[in-house]
Amino acid sequence: MDFLTYLPSWLLPAVVILTISCILMLWTKPSKGASGLNLPPGPPSLPLIGNLHQLIGKSFHETVYKLAEKYGPIMHIHMGSQPVVVISSSALATEAFKTHDHILANRQYSNNLRRLTFDYNDIAWAPYGDHSKHMRRVLVTEFLNSRMSKSFKKVLDMEVKSMLDNLPYGTETNLNKVFGNFVCDFTSKVVTGKSYRDVKIRGKTMKEMLDEMIILFSGSFSEIFPKYGWILEDLSGWTRRVDKHMANYNDLLELMIDEHLDHTSEDEKDMIDACRPLLNREEMKAIMSNVYNGAIDTSYLTLVWAMSEIVKNPRVMHKLQDEIRSNAGNKARLDETDTSKMTYLKYVVKETLRRHGPSPFLIPRDCVSHIQIGGYDILPGTKVLINAWGIAKDPKVWTENANEFHPDRFENHVLEQFHMVPFGGGRRACPGYNFATLNIEVVLANLLYSIDWKLPPGLTLEDFNMEEEGSLLVTKKTPLYLVPIKHNTQA
């Protein structure tokens, strides 16, 4: 719902007038009702606007979580005129992903969403079918394979070395910026072979374009008013904003492809080398966009939250550093071979993804036929929203300390498939989840192997801010500042 904060001030009164007019029209028509159906429980809704009055202006995922505490792990709400079912438990997510995944494999679509996804040529948003299966197959078999991973390991090692070498040791450092630059450079190099972080298109950098993409994906009027939302998007300037952004973003991706074709290398292969023979140009841009949007912010935020929790919990930091340093020998830098032996490191990454999953909700699913979940009826045209943030706090799975950062829980916890879903599940699960987690483990291991981390002068653990903000992505409200101190690995 963040998109509403970026709209002009005159638009809300216009929506109110339109709403009143529609309510009057609705009252003159007989209600069809839902006789004989057992819909999920939920809060009372108003005509036309549904439950928007309860959701706008607040932290969307926290508001939904509180409503789910009251109405249950499967809940029916209306976002505008759009019926939505929210699933907030592991057991019901399992039923959705396993029993009804084929019914819930599609998205809900709009004209602006079509623009943002290169005419639905991507993986994440394409209608489920032969095309989406082909795109996913190309990404997995040609890009995320063992042969390509050898090349990526070299890139990762070089980027980790560059990050460590350029840290201002002994000085208060903004790790949001450090991690953001690192992830942007690494992702760009595995996709194109070079960094485009500082390249500008009409004054906009790649990072600024990706930040804008997050805003544009955060919601739209078409999602809450499917029949006439496009009118409000045109009136508000939202459509023009999408078009302006996509002109810049398209030119950036075109530049990447053109420069790559001019400087191909037989020695070092990247994603364009691997996938281009099997994709047309629009498909290539769409899959590049998926990787950039899916990998950069997810990895960056996970690193920020992981380091925040590690520093906030000295016992965790000491235990983790002991494991890393006892397994590392005297190597200059660590790689995947080293981290494969570090059990507690894997617990820390899992707990970070559980406690601070980058996106509180999975991309909404569209129910295409009548099904039942948890004994409740879900009707065609309903948007099904998987509450990953709520599932990660499900007391039936995580007990009473679900809100605490406690990596040791995984020593005794048998993690079943849908106990946590930071990367989705079923047919639309993120294909790069294993690639992402392995890389995060390597980066964290190096940060804690060769560096001791201190709080900035004057800051105590009690004052350390762990507040969240955002809806499509949950970010740390204040940047993470720490002081890196070189650790003597030879001692």
UniProtKB/Swiss-Prot annotation:
GO MF annotation: an example: iron ion binding
TM spans (from-to): 7-27
Cofactor: heme
Catalytic reaction(s) noted: 8beta-hydroxygermacra-1(10),4,11(13)-trien-12-oate + reduced [NADPH--hemoprotein reductase] + O2 = eupatolide + oxidized [NADPH--hemoprotein reductase] + 2 H2O
Pfam families: p450
InterPro entries according to UniProt: Cyt_P450, Cyt_P450_CS, Cyt_P450_E_grp-I, Cyt_P450_sf
Membrane topology according to the record: Single-pass type II membrane protein
Any GO BP: terpenoid biosynthetic process
One of the record's GO cellular component terms: membrane
Swiss-Prot/TrEMBL keywords: Heme, Iron, Membrane, Metal-binding, Monooxygenase, Oxidoreductase, Signal-anchor, Transmembrane, Transmembrane helix
Alphabetical list of PROSITE patterns matching this protein: CYTOCHROME_P450
Primary location class: membrane
Family of the protein in this entry: Belongs to the cytochrome P450 family.
PANTHER family: CYTOCHROME P450 FAMILY 71 PROTEIN, PREMNASPIRODIENE OXYGENASE-LIKE
Protein name: Eupatolide synthase
